[in-house]
Amino acid sequence: MIKNANIHFNHQGTPVANDFDDIYYSDDNGLAESYYVFYQQNNIDTRLQSHDQAHFVIAETGFGTGLNFLNTCQHFTDHLARQQVQKQLNYGVKRLHFIAFEKHPLSVSDLSKILTAWPELNLLSEQLISQYPINLAGCHRLEFNNGTIVLDLYFGDALESIKTMSYPRSGIVDAWFLDGFAPSKNPDMWQQSLFNAMVNISKVGATLATFTAAGFVRRGLSDAGFTMQKVKGFAHKRSMLIGTLKHTNDTQSAPSYFNHDVSPLSNVAVIGGGIASSCILYSLAKRGISSQLFCQDAAPAMGASHNVQGAVYPHLQAKNSPHSELFAHSFLYAKRLYKQLLNDGFSFDHSWCGVLQHAVKQPLVDRHENLAQQQLWPQTLMRNVTAEQGDTIAGVTTGYSGVYFEQGGWVNPPQLVNAMLSAAHCLSPYKSTFNCHIEQLKKTSNGWLLFSNGKQFGPFSDVIICAGEHSDAFAQTKALPIVGVRGQVSHVQASEQSTKLKTVLCHKGYFTPAYLDHHCMGATFEKNTKSRQVTEQDNLSNREQLLNFYGHCNFATSLGNITAAKAAVRCSFIDHLPMAGEWVEQSDYLTAFANLRLGKRYQYQALSKKQQGLHIFTGFGARALCSAPLCSEHLISSLNNEPRPLSERVSQAIHPARFIVRDLIRNKI
């Protein structure tokens, strides 16, 4: 579990870490120190003008008060303003990406107090405070100023965090801020293994700067691959260290068989129309990448995203699995994104009323007890509640204990999809083509061509298929192992008793608080059928399921008539995880990774061939509202040679090639 820093303030008002007996920044002028030591000595201003990519990546060991980050953001904002004034918009860096590692994060109350000392940073500080993560280990992606600044804030040990990262072979970091506490007081932040790990994720030519001039630090960084030198330190300090990476670590482990160095995205075709495609378009728009949406329906969100109320909460297990890691961080990112959309004026009906997962059967009681015993998840993310506590939360009497997701709730999916599409269009206008069923994809020397009813579209540098159950409809993707699951949600009239319900209830299905005088009740699960016809039998099944668990409750027995329903086919896979990544023909993998049949130890022997520009983004099932936003960021970050918000193990768990790889390892193909 992540533990907050234990601090006090000295006579100058500077925060001091009690566990390390060291100050977070200079008593004299912390802001000036930050600028001189890190920003100026890494020559950031000049490099922002001449960098060969649209994004610049800085990594910091020791986030602390966030002062270095906020100060850098302020100067980067000034850089963008100068570009605008000078109309130099066709070159120079457009997005700042900041990676920071923090083992003992400050509490949000301590951070708020500390940052009041820097009123000139207020606009950025307020954004940081409003998004500041809960104490969950791993990468928290925070976004500032319409996505022009991205902070990947890792909670946990720096070395262990770097080991989890997914990155291309050429590296991702352009500059390092080494700002842990003094080496004599916090030696873990200045160990050789950390320096070597830094090199693994750095580009050749990456620079570093640090306040210390300790000899063992200079020698360690030199041994790792940096050319080091001493320069004048800040204020009264005699010297400090700077360095440049001349070569990468030859002994580094190769990234996984899913990683490639890619050409940046330029013009992308997105096939879909629901939550998944709206997330992709939004991620592309934040980067100013040209795109076009192709939707077979007359309007967005006409398929599986067409429900009136969709529950938003993470699906967590009693173990630190890739599944749990994905959904925990995806949920927190989705909440931040939805809050930002609302703050920006893009409205959609919703209620963050919490989600109460009831233990309606003994196996669920046992599962919830196991969740509590493992203590993997912060109480602010989920907590176990007794029957009495649960009934108080829900506002109705059920008699069930359960797990409560306080930050969960429900949103209106069609409205959310349209809000995201509108927000994307405001950031970077894109084309939309509706009533357009794409029948064929063809790769040419100039890019991808799309065909529909005798019309040709393109060429496009990349195609991202977000078509749900129809994602396997193309010659290139017919081998996708999609599991289609039909589901029907019923809309039932609220009663005086049922309107007392204050939170979403989950049992075998789900039941929402009243909205427009109705509750959403469902959903059915039926495999091997593609019918979208609403049936009375499924309405009866939804009511029977509710009464089976809540037949003793007034809110359930007093409900009115079912007046409407929605039916759709969810797209999923047998491991209940989505797909986000490049789609490669099975024959290519069979050739490139034949050694996988000899055992897992051969999994890093080769990389598959250069990406062809066809990508899959589907399989979210009933959890797209939770997981699609962060998975979208991960996919577009990967395709744009940016830092990725999901770990290497999660990247592999959701990659389209995972089933091929598993079958090779098991010698099934």
Swiss-Prot record:
Q: Which GO terms describe its cellular component?
A: cytoplasm
Kindly state which keywords UniProt assigns to this record, in alphabetical order.
Answer: Cytoplasm, FAD, Flavoprotein, Methyltransferase, Multifunctional enzyme, Oxidoreductase, S-adenosyl-L-methionine, Transferase, tRNA processing
GO term, biological process aspect, one: tRNA wobble uridine modification
What residue spans carry the region label tRNA (mnm(5)s(2)U34)-methyltransferase? 1-246
Q: Kindly list the places in or outside the cell where this protein is found, as annotated in its UniProt entry.
A: Cytoplasm
List every stretch annotated FAD-dependent cmnm(5)s(2)U34 oxidoreductase. Answer: 271-669
Query: What does the UniProt function comment say about this protein?
Result: Catalyzes the last two steps in the biosynthesis of 5-methylaminomethyl-2-thiouridine (mnm(5)s(2)U) at the wobble position (U34) in tRNA. Catalyzes the FAD-dependent demodification of cmnm(5)s(2)U34 to nm(5)s(2)U34, followed by the transfer of a methyl group from S-adenosyl-L-methionine to nm(5)s(2)U34, to form mnm(5)s(2)U34.
In terms of NCBIfam families, this protein maps to: MnmC_Cterm, PRK01747.1-2, tRNA_MNMC2
According to UniProt, the name of this protein is tRNA 5-methylaminomethyl-2-thiouridine biosynthesis bifunctional protein MnmC
Species classification: Bacteria, Pseudomonadati, Pseudomonadota, Gammaproteobacteria, Alteromonadales
Q: In the UniProt record, what gene is named as encoding this protein?
A: mnmC
